[in-house]
Design a protein with these regions (language model features):
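Residue-level recognition of beta-strand microenvironments
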Residues: 6, 26, 38, 79, ...
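N-terminal glycine-rich beta->alpha transition that marks the start or flank
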Residues: 21-73
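NAD(P)H dinucleotide-binding glycine-rich loop of Rossmann-like/cofactor-binding domains
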Residues: 61-62, 95-150
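Short structural boundary motif marking the start of a folded domain
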Residues: 1-4
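A glycine-/small-residue-rich N-terminal strand-loop-strand element
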Residues: 73-97
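Short N-terminal binding/cap micro-motifs at the start of the first secondary-structure element
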Residues: 10-16, 42-43
Length: 150
């Protein structure tokens, strides 16, 4: 697959080239999505400049190259053995919390809880831009799940 990594922190000039990368594998709770559209979230710009690097560097398997991006819309290409909600061909949108699976590329792996069905009345571009708008709602949802699952 093609992707656009960064090799160091900095301004937009750190996006130097598009390169060939391996398509990510998925685990039993994940979905592989062929990305149709991705959006640039403000946190992506901050991460590119080094914001939160102490935390993010501890979470990443390798420091660089790093594929940024988290918000997407696309089409399901593969589902893990424990995924029941989605099937190949489903149109989805979502936001990844995985620091090792960015979205400035052609494919990304998502936990099944990080994506949902793309609304039929939205284009792929429109759906990819929704995720930042719902960040507050997602935070509340994750908090409620954590509180009530105990």
């Amino acid at each position: 697959m093609l992707g656009m990594p960064i090799y160091r922190y900095g301004d937009s000039s750190v996006f130097e080239q598009i390169i060939e990368l391996p398509i990510p594998g998925i685990n039993r709770n994940e979905v592989l999505v062929k990305i149709k559209s991705t959006s640039v979230n403000p946190i992506d710009l901050m991460k590119r400049e080094g914001y939160g690097k102490t935390i993010f560097e501890k979470q990443r398997k390798q420091l660089f190259p790093w594929i940024l991006g988290s918000d997407i819309s696309g089409v399901v290409k593969e589902v893990g053995s424990k995924v029941t909600k989605f099937k190949e061909g489903d149109e989805v949108y979502g936001s990844s919390s995985n620091p090792n699976s960015g979205t400035y590329c052609e494919y990304a792996a998502f936990n099944q809880n990080e994506i949902d069905f793309k609304p039929n009345n939205l284009s792929f571009n429109e759906a990819a831009s929704l995720n930042d708008k719902f960040l507050g709602l997602k935070s509340i949802s994750f908090w409620l799940k954590a509180v009530y699952s105990q």
